[in-house]
């Protein structure tokens, strides 16, 4: 209900829009309303009433466009389905008496009358009365047309009521009253309006005429008037546009006349028939199709009403020679018969007579229409036995006539005439095709006269359907015989018809039967007739054919019957039939009838060729030798009787020789002796009659040999056959008695064919003892013929025929040697495969026929070559010989010329067919490698042939398990999509490679590698795929062949590198081998000289990148490296392994699990190779082009090892196992230098990712052995590494570093300074990693470290000791170091002036730490040491190294309290400022404070300053002079007097010459200060 409400809510909105003035929107609204009203079953009354109001209003509104008013009227009429009375009331209210209504009101009434007949009839009287009052008021043309439309609809409605009133739901009304009003309206219109009506008005009257007259005919009182109006209607046939409506009205009237059984007056009927026939047979302007159909319907109505009158009319009209009239009448007769009007069947004879009147008409249209009418008559049974035969004969005669006219056209014939004749011919065949011979009366008409059309040549084209008709008739008769057990012979009087003889029928049917092998219908029909009519041919044949025919028909059951097999079986049937008949006269007559039918077939037709063979077979079966001899002689003397004299005589004599060899040879010899060939040839030229030549006789002898009984043949072969052939050929090759090479193509072909047939005959004789003495000579002759053939054209079939001849000759004894086989095959291959491409060969032809012939010769020649190779290869039982012969094709299979390659593969595929069997030891590996990759060649023919050959190779070895699957895949290789080709080839490879013998894999790989070098890109890819597939399948079994395979692959590398894709496949092959034999491959690659060349590096990379081998590869290399470093000695092999590892890691191989072991091994290798040189024997011997001035660099083992370790660390960083070194890339330089190796190791150790403590612990475990290694370098490496690890707390926590600590204690005493240094560093770093261990082992550690302070020869050891002490002292108390304090302080002071910044800095910093650890016991001692050290701290405030300056400031701050000089703190704070104070100012302020506090310290500073005047650092010299200046300035008089002024002056004078200007100035200033002070206190200088 909700949907209902929504729907009507939308309608209300729509209706509301109708009140607007927008006409455009109204048009859309009315279209919508029409659809809505028609699709709605229930509508609200209020909505209906509103719609009636608006639609009626718009329909009558003159201001609205006509189209819109029409739409409104349609909506109004459609509303009647919901409320008819309201709609009718609305319309009637606007249809008032004596008041001219709106046009659309009238139209609405008319539409209501036809759409709602039942509801409209009760209102009809009122409507008609009102309309009657309006007619006189109508003046407008459009309004008159509207009233005519209304009259038409009202008449249709009343007519329906009159004839079907019982179906209406209310009591019967008085229809006469309604028809009275219609009569008055119609009469007024016809009298007043019709005479002056315009064309449009007239059309409206015509449309109303039929319904109105049809209605009036039911009233007897109106009948005469109504019929009188028909004449007016016929007179309107003037305008082509109106013809259809006139005929339509006429059809309505005729229908009503038949309904009310009203006979038309004769004259009127005649007029109607003439008018209607004119509508059908209009010539100038073809009738409109609809009008013609309506007129034909009118004729059907008239045929039903009075068939006699209609046929009389047709008989009268058809006698005219008018083509259109005759064609029209024949068409009308056909349609009338098709309508199966019962009354018409009684007039069959009249129809037949009418048809016979036009049988002589030569018009194509009339002939075709006649044939179609006869077809319909036959189908509907309108054929009578007495009169029917001429009609059947007409069908065949028309076919023959059209055939003659097409074969021998008149010159003036146009294309239209030719098309017409073809149309008649096709119609004749179509009539025969549809002819049902069992229709009532037809058997009597047809049998046996239908047989007369079997033999004549002109009816050959009808045999398809003729045989079927005869078969149906005979089978129907046979059925009758079985049903009633008595004969009801079909034979009736044949009249003047002459039936064919049994021999004629047999000859004709047997020859036509040969076409059954081609699937032709007439051939199947002929053999079918022979099967069912043996008694008609000869009574003796019934039983034999009954048993033989089923077997004979078996070959025809398949889709492709073999022509040769079918021909053989037919000839065998003929032989057996003639033997069964055993009647010499009957057989002789049959041979004559065969001869007489020679003209029925063309010379090139299959029927003619079979006829010759059948004739020869008949003569062979004839026992009358004189007759046979005479017939043969006649054919030899007058061969033109046979059509093609050569083929005819050859076939006939050949087949005749099967039973009459002696007769044939004798007649031939007699003819040959008597004939003068040259004279006969001249006569033939002038007379036009051809006679046999020597060439013809050569062919005949070959045919005789082929068909002769084999045992008789061998006895007469040499002298009577071969002797004659060679004699005739020799005579043909002589000019004036001199032998020359005859270039006559016909002679060469005839000779070759004859030799071939002789070879076949001898082979078929199967006499193993027979030695064919002419074999070698004939093969030589054949080779001479093929050698003479040009290599740029293929115009002759010589190659093809010679190849066939050689194939058969080669099989005969005596056998040929291998060299003979190879020479024969090579010569034939060289004469075919290098020919130009087929398209180029074809372009040499001038016509399409020439080009087709060239293509035919090409295909046949290639086929013959393939068969020759197949025969000669597989007939040999020696596998090696077979392979030798196959090798002849090798160069052609990989030819760069696409067409040569295609031919080679086509030949190979013919050699390797599935049914061949190879010798036992025949090897397929090499051939598979050669052939299989071409499954992706450029041409689909090559791809198919290559795959067929591959499958054939497997079958030849007896491997047939996967053949069906392979053939299924092969079909897809026709695709042009390269990806599809590769995919299919890959699938085939996976199957085929399983069957390659393992011992042949090496040669298979050699072939594929060659293919990778030489073939096109797609075949190259296929080579790679096949190679990989083979290795995957057989890789595990290749251990014995591994070295040879690898050597082969390496050999191809330089060339393959130039082809990227090929190179990648080769690398994948190595990887595949390695996945099975990793150790062997690794050993092989490690033997390559160092440094590895590009190819070797690429191989390592390939192995690493292959997922199947990468894991095994790294483990194998690690294993090798472990073995090579077992004695802590780095040999060349170990370096090779490192280089290999470098290439592997460089590919990004994951090393997480192998990293600890690999890292320690490589670090060990670096350590053990320090300072080594590469032995010359291991260096690569390849020469490298060097730039001018460049020196040859030899590889450094340590550098190579370091590079690998560097690569490892880079990968470790990527995997989060290590971090960037603080030394950067300098790390590796340090590491590979023997002098800095330990520094590099320390930096490397610092780059370890301590968060990966598990990894580092594994490294420590592997590296622990280094601490006890016999190699000093390795011990240093281990000690350096561990020294850095000692500072990591997490490693102390999880690892066992206590043992390492012990080793460090021991090594701290070692004679090797670097080892001692690293041990001391490790002890010092222990303070960071394990403070508790320092406190626990403080004595041991302090003693070791302090001992390092005495190693003055190696500053680095001292520096390391100072640093270690500083770290350790930070963890100890003054009590812990009490025993060592003095010694440490004294040793530390000795390094304040060390030249190395690091030592000075560490010493100063350590002194600072010592100050904090000074106990009560050592306080005075330390204060004295501070006084002594004060000069160093003050001067080094301006040390070149800023860090040292800062350290001096810090130590001064700490040490001042020991001297009681706290006043200096403020001064020292100035040193913390951003801008340092000037040294002179600082020193003067310092000295000023000291002078006030402690003059002794100033004096101590002065006494220690002299040593700094000679310092190597300019800044220190300058500072010392400035300090001296400040001291002099602030010394008291007593201390100034104590100065050694002479020495001081001398030293200052020397410094005035110092290279440094600042020193010079300071010295000058100090001298001036000295002079001034001396003056001040009156002391002489």
Curated annotation (Swiss-Prot):
Gene Ontology biological process terms in this record: cell differentiation; protein kinase A signaling; spermatogenesis
Maturation and modification: Constitutively phosphorylated on serine and threonine residues in acrosomal region of the sperm head, midpiece and flagellar regions of noncapacitated spermatozoa. Phosphorylation on tyrosine residues increases upon sperm capacitation within the acrosomal and tail regions in a protein kinase A (PKA)-dependent signaling pathway.
Entry comment describing in which tissues the protein is expressed: Expressed strongly in round spermatids and fully mature spermatozoa. Expressed weakly in pachytene spermatocytes (at protein level). Isoform 2 is specifically expressed in the testis. Isoform 2 is expressed in pachytene spermatocytes and round spermatids. Isoform 3 is weakly expressed in testis.
Subunit structure: Found in a complex at least composed of MROH2B isoform 2, PRKACA isoform 2 and TCP11. Interacts with PRKACA isoform 2. Interacts with TCP11.
Protein name as catalogued: Maestro heat-like repeat-containing protein family member 2B
The encoding gene: Mroh2b
GO-annotated cellular components: acrosomal vesicle; cytoplasm; sperm flagellum; sperm midpiece
Function field: May play a role in the process of sperm capacitation.
The keyword rRNA processing appears for this protein: no
InterPro entries per record: ARM-like, ARM-type_fold, HEAT_Maestro, HEAT_MROH2B-like, Maestro-like_HEAT, Maestro_heat-like_prot, MROH2B-like_N_HEAT
Annotated localization: Cytoplasm; Cytoplasmic vesicle, Secretory vesicle, Acrosome; Cell projection, Cilium, Flagellum
HEAT repeats: 123-160, 305-342, 401-441, 464-501, 526-543, 544-580, 658-695, 773-815, 960-997, 1017-1055, 1112-1150, 1153-1191, 1254-1291, 1295-1332, 1359-1379, 1380-1416
Gene deletion effect: Embryonically lethal before 10 dpc.
UniProt KW keywords: Cell projection, Cilium, Cytoplasm, Cytoplasmic vesicle, Differentiation, Flagellum, Repeat, Spermatogenesis
Pfam families: HEAT_Maestro, HEAT_Maestro_2, HEAT_MROH2B_1st, HEAT_MROH2B_C
